């Protein structure tokens, strides 16, 4: 603790001190000194350079300026009030806002509250986490996991076959204009007429609301609306009036393709606005919400479930897992993969999504993915707090 201070006024620009190399010597087995040792001055200079490394890679709490302030305060005399006031003023200055007006609200700025703040974390070795989901408030479609896949209507057959097998194996469902495979559940995006083979059907909300004779699918098929950011409020009212089963929220307005999702960051406020309208009408349990857009990981999916969705739809992430090139705005499947590799990749993606989402639920003390709720989340930026309807970290105030 009594080593001389190694702080150097030139610590930011000190060059590296190179030790002279002497080789292994005539008798290497005797382990001679192969490099010259540092002098005291050189050792202090190198220690100062280490301080620079720490400062450049340190946490936000200990930036370069804050560390320099600490050293300055350590050398100040008790009676030097002017310098004390100067240091205090510098510490009270607001830092530059790293998020300008163009900063978008994304799921990255939402974090989960750990369960040990209020309850016990769930041990995966002792208790499982339920992932089974019933999609549809009235006529339900039973899924083993709360995930559906979309965007492969125009993909090559070998890609569709791989995705279909993974969907079937996981007990998920495919969202598209045509079925992806005989064994995979299919939620039909209706353009002309409904298919009796579809496990559920979803209609474009604007077209459905403009059609006075809209009646939905068959009596046994769950019926939903494909909703975008512009018509979410009217779609909620219409769906409740017609006793529909679910709303598929697509802020990019691109389903059944992936162009909308790949065009930019999704509008995550669509979930908050849909839930807010349902709560305003006191009919939150009468219809289910499915979210699509920008989901890259199981953590993203868990955040969407916590914000009010009962299931989510994976699109671009699955395409990327299968080696797609998305630089042109639509996925181009040109990766050199054989059938086994494609099947394994698509299977692994859904497996990873499910495992990671379950992990987030367990970390919040939940044994069912559907028990995730907005109270399990906090926002770290004001724009996301407003978009998602979630309080800022360290606060109960919702912006």
Residue ranges and their predicted role:
Residues 1-4, 63-67, 181-182, 226, ...:
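A glycine-rich phosphate-binding loop feature that marks nucleotide/adenosyl-phosphate handling sites
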Residues 1-88, 92, 230-231, 260-269, ...:
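Ferredoxin-type iron-sulfur electron-transfer modules and their immediate structural context
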Residues 25-27, 143-149, 251-261:
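Gly-rich Lys/Arg/Thr-decorated short loops/hinges at beta-loop-alpha junctions or inter-strand turns
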Residues 56, 63-168, 172-173, 374-399:
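Conserved, well-structured core domains of diverse proteins
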Residues 145-150, 157-217, 233, 237:
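Catalytic alpha/beta active-site cores
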Residues 171-172, 198, 244, 309, ...:
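A structural motif
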Residues 201-341:
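Glycine-rich phosphate/ribose-binding loops and adjacent secondary-structure elements
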Residues 329-337, 345-399:
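Catalytic or ion-coupling anion/metal-binding cores of large enzyme and transporter domains
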């Amino acid at each position: 603790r009594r080593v001389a201070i190694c702080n150097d006024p030139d610590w930011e620009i000190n060059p590296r001190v190179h030790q002279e190399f002497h080789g292994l010597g005539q008798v290497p087995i005797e382990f001679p000194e192969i490099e010259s040792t540092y002098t005291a001055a050189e050792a202090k200079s190198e220690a100062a350079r280490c301080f620079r490394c720490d400062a450049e890679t340190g946490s936000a709490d200990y930036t370069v300026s804050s560390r320099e302030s600490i050293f300055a305060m350590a050398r100040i005399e008790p009676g030097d009030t002017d310098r004390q006031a100067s240091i205090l003023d510098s510490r009270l200055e607001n830092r530059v806002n790293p998020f300008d007006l163009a900063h978008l609200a994304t799921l990255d700025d939402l974090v989960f509250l750990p369960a040990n703040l209020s309850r016990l974390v769930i041990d995966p070795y002792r208790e499982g986490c339920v992932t089974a989901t019933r999609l549809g408030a009235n006529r339900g479609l039973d899924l083993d996991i709360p995930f559906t896949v979309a965007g492969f209507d125009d993909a090559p057959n070998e890609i569709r076959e791989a995705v279909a097998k993974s969907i079937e194996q996981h007990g998920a469902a495919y969202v598209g204009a045509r079925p992806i495979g005989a064994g995979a559940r299919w939620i039909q995006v209706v353009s002309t007429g409904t298919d009796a083979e579809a496990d559920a059907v979803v209609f474009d909300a604007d077209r459905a609301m403009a059609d006075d004779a809209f009646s939905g699918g068959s009596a046994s098929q769950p019926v939903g609306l494909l909703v975008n950011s512009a018509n979410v409020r009217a779609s909620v009212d219409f769906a409740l009036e017609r006793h529909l089963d679910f709303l598929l929220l697509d802020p990019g307005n691109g389903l059944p393709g992936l162009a909308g999702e790949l065009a930019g960051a999704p509008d995550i406020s669509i979930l908050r606005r849909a839930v807010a309208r349902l709560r305003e009408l006191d009919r939150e349990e009468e219809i289910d919400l499915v979210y699509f857009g920008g989901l890259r990981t199981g953590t993203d999916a868990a955040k969407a479930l916590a914000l009010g969705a009962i299931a989510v739809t994976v699109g671009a992430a699955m395409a990327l897992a299968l080696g797609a090139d998305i630089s042109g705005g639509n996925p181009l499947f040109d990766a050199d993969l054989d059938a086994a590799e494609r099947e394994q990749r698509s299977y692994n993606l859904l497996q990873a999504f499910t495992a990671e989402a379950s992990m987030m639920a367990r970390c919040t003390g939940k044994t069912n993915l559907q028990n995730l709720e907005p109270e399990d989340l906090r926002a770290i930026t004001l724009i996301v707090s407003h978009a998602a309807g979630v309080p800022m970290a360290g606060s109960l105030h919702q912006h």
